[in-house]
Amino acid sequence: GPLRVRTSKMALPAALLRAAALRCRLPLASVGRRHLAAEAFVRDRPHVNVGTIGHVDHGKTTLTAAITKVLSESGGARFQRYEDIDKAPEERARGITINAAHVEYSTARRHYAHTDCPGHADYVKNMITGTAPLDGCILVVAATDGQMPQTREHLLLARQVGVRHVVVYVNKADAVSDAELLPLVELELRELLAEMGYDAERTPVVVGSALCALQDRDPTLGRDSVLQLLEAIDTHIPLPHRDVQRPFLLPIEGVHSIPGRGTVVTGTVERGAVSKGDECELRGYGRVLKAVVTGLETFHKSLPRAEAGDNVGALLRGLRREDVRRGMVMGQPGALRDHRKLQAQVYVLSAQ
């Protein structure tokens, strides 16, 4: 049967950064309470992967929480507080996001998996890992600061890993003493977008305050701006093409064990589809393993079939926890090949 999965933040070592333009995958789920999912995932609208990027302390996690709060009013999300998203003790103590976190929500048109990426320069490798699977991203910029070092760096990295569509949220508008500064911030950001190769004229820029939305203050800057942002995401970020016809492939990012049940691997399905009961093959580190998928789950919900773009935990029979390592791949039997040569794009982190 399906397993119970809860989202969590996980440390992502640099060794996880994979080739093919750093198209890494984020460990989106870890095994939590060990019983069956009470709810089935309903695939009733297109699935899109998005995320928040931007400079440290510009409000990415606050905006993520605000989105879930606003959508919870219409049943489109489960409200997750800031503290629910920034779970790690060090993150709470320092007030910054270190590892990418993951939430889900739905608008009237789409289902979203949302990655909240860290903004601090020390954790840029985690930001790269969180951004690579995205179909589009939300660039969060504090109106009080304007463009900052990680604003530029995150936008550049997003472009390099293949994120082609961006929506801008100018946050903390309630804290600006002179409202005439807001158009200048927007102008500066459009110049940056053009410099990085994005369509500066057509990129939506929404001005608001995520904190106002969380605290039910100033509906125009708060709740209304979040709804405006969601509308911009719905319309500006196109539906991605999902490669569901080719053989199933899932890069493994997390490995867990449920005593008496089996081994769980987590990751984002890169192509194809897999169903409960399917046989699969795992390769990597010189090993070839066989297993059977006995359960699939996403965001606390069981699903009979996972498709390209889905963030899943798969329960496997026939494997021990110590047999599988992060960095291996799972796929359709006979469809995987080992390679010794690759092309990679390398981003060298500097002390600055």
From Swiss-Prot:
Region called G4, residue ranges: 171-174
Name the positions where GTP binds: 57, 59-62, 171, 174, 209-211
Mind telling me which CDD domains this protein's record contains? EF_Tu (cd01884), EFTU_II (cd03697)
Q: Where is this region: G1?
A: 54-61
In terms of InterPro entries, this protein maps to: EF-Tu_GTP-bd (IPR041709), EF-Tu_GTPase (IPR050055), EFTu-like_2 (IPR004161), EFTU_2 (IPR033720), G_TR_CS (IPR031157), P-loop_NTPase (IPR027417), T_Tr_GTP-bd_dom (IPR000795), Transl_B-barrel_sf (IPR009000)
Give the UniProt subcellular location, in the record's own words. Mitochondrion
Segments of this protein annotated with the region G3: 116-119
Annotated region described as G5, given as residue ranges = 209-211
Q: Could you cite one Gene Ontology molecular function of this protein?
A: translation elongation factor activity
What is one process in the GO biological process aspect for this record? translational elongation
The record's section on Gene3D superfamilies has: P-loop containing nucleotide triphosphate hydrolases (3.40.50.300), Translation factors (2.40.30.10)
Q: Which NCBIfam families match?
A: PRK00049.1, PRK12736.1
The record describes the protein's role as:
GTP hydrolase that promotes the GTP-dependent binding of aminoacyl-tRNA to the A-site of ribosomes during protein biosynthesis.
What is this protein's record name?
A: Elongation factor Tu, mitochondrial
Report the source organism: Gallus gallus
